[in-house]
């Protein structure tokens, strides 16, 4: 096996990463029902040793990987965060690279401060859904706080990718005319490094080599601030430490598996409890239904002298999270076209889901393959409390793809609307995308009015700190059986 060091490749590949291990604090438990709090919050010495052993094994497992190459089709469009790219020129590859590398990449970390109530100092092996949720929220915050044309200036070349003509010919080109190959132009910086240096500084592109990026020190400082909010430190508002604390309200503990629906509600509460976000709300759909009245109620809550000029007085921007289930034990192929149409929308900020017990963050697709960011790579903790902490490990230059058929049906879809007009456009565009489903029932729906009018608890500003309400599909009168024990709606 061609194994390389953690600094050599950014991704775990293959099917060996599963997050279905038992909690490190469950040694005394018989495996039936929830683990008693008294056991879990007071780990004894044996539990600590066991947790350290498991953590050490996971650090090794997720810190090394097999080098592979991702191939992109030069004759088919690729969609990334609502934008289309056709790799028929180096300019188009460069445009894609700038957007992809600018995405915030959050992965397993090791050696961070101990999580409260446990002996864990790493989330390796169990925290991938938390990391995927963090990436989804980070994308929403970048849209909310930074200019729409912002690009990260530390432009890394794409690593381990190739661009090929995967079809006999392009309809727009005469027979016999081949497209140029760009693979030689985008060699991995790893292969060009000084083996003893361990640094890619000499191969990093300067701002002058990134003509579309522009430079604004205040914007770059804000970008760094956003990343710091996801740091692995107890004070980081969206870090693993805070999310684990919020998970306790849903009966979860450090070391447990977190489903995409639970993570959606954890993100909602995390944003609501962060004072800096007076101009942003997070809404989580209930029963695969977005109640427009509830969204309006959240967004029309009073603001405190923040941005309201573009969306009407007192209007908050909103991140909408929709937990869904796209099949039974596996993805229903009838929903693939619908998922593609959703990922084509500018208002879509990604999907958290992945393979079974192996969460990924989906940000686009090409043909029948999803484009994703993978959290299953263990990196040393970065001290984000330092003013000039390194951003390199929070951005990825290795795009990865997988077939739609490998996508787990349990997922959460994210959307962002900055203004009231944007929200209205979102409802229209997403509804049109949902209508492309070949199934009788859409993935989810938009409904006028409020959830309480249908017997559900709404998500008003006053209820944001309450426990997450996760509803089953029993109220939806759909004669389908549940395909698993997860708390998602089966379509």
Predicted features along the sequence, with ranges:
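Cysteine-dependent deubiquitinase/ubiquitin-like isopeptidase catalytic cores across multiple families
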Residues: 2-122, 126, 132, 138-491
């Amino acid at each position: 096996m061609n194994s390389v060091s953690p600094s050599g490749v950014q991704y775990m590949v293959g099917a060996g990463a599963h997050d279905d291990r038992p909690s490190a604090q469950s040694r005394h438990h018989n495996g039936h029902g929830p683990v008693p709090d008294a056991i879990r919050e007071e780990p004894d010495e044996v539990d600590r040793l066991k947790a350290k052993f498991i953590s050490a094994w996971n650090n090794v497992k997720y810190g090394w990987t097999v080098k592979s190459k991702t191939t992109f089709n030069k004759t088919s469009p690729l969609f990334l965060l609502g934008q289309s790219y056709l790799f028929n020129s180096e300019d188009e590859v460069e445009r894609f690279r700038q957007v992809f590398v600018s995405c915030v990449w959050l992965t397993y970390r090791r050696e961070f401060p101990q999580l409260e109530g446990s002996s864990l100092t790493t989330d390796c092996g169990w925290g991938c859904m938390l990391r995927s949720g963090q990436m989804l929220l980070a994308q929403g915050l970048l849209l909310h706080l930074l200019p729409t044309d912002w690009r990260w200036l530390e432009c890394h070349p794409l690593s381990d990718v190739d661009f090929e003509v995967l079809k006999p010919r392009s309809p727009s080109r005469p027979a016999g005319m081949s497209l140029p190959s760009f693979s030689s132009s985008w060699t991995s910086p790893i292969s060009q490094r000084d083996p003893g240096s361990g640094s890619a500084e000499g191969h990093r592109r300067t701002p002058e080599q990134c003509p579309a990026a522009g430079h604004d020190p205040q914007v770059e400082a804000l970008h760094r601030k956003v990343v710091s909010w996801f740091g692995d430190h107890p004070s980081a508002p969206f870090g693993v430490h805070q999310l684990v604390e919020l998970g306790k309200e849903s009966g979860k503990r450090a070391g447990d598996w977190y489903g995409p629906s639970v993570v959606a509600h954890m993100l909602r509460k995390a944003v609501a409890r962060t004072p800096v976000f007076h101009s942003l709300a997070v809404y989580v759909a209930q029963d695969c239904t977005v109640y427009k009245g509830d969204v309006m109620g959240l967004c029309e809550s009073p603001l405190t002298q923040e941005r309201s000029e573009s969306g009407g007085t007192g209007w908050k921007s909103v991140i909408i999270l929709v937990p869904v289930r796209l099949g039974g034990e596996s993805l229903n192929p009838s929903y693939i076209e619908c998922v593609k149409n959703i990922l084509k929308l500018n208002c879509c900020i990604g999907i958290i889901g992945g393979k079974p017990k192996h969460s990924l963050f989906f940000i686009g697709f090409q043909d029948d393959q999803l484009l994703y960011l993978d959290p299953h790579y263990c990196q040393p903790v970065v001290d984000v409390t330092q003013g000039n902490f390194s951003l390199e490990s929070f951005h990825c230059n290795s795009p990865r793809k997988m077939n739609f058929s490998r996508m787990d049906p349990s997922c959460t879809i994210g959307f962002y609307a900055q203004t009231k007009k944007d929200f209205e456009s979102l409802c229209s565009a997403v509804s049109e995308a949902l209508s492309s489903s070949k199934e009788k029932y859409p993935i989810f729906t938009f409904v006028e009015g409020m959830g309480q009018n249908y017997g559900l608890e709404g998500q008003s500003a006053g209820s944001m700190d309450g426990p997450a309400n996760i509803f089953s599909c029993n109220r939806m009168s759909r004669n389908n059986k549940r395909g698993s024990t997860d708390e998602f709606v089966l379509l």
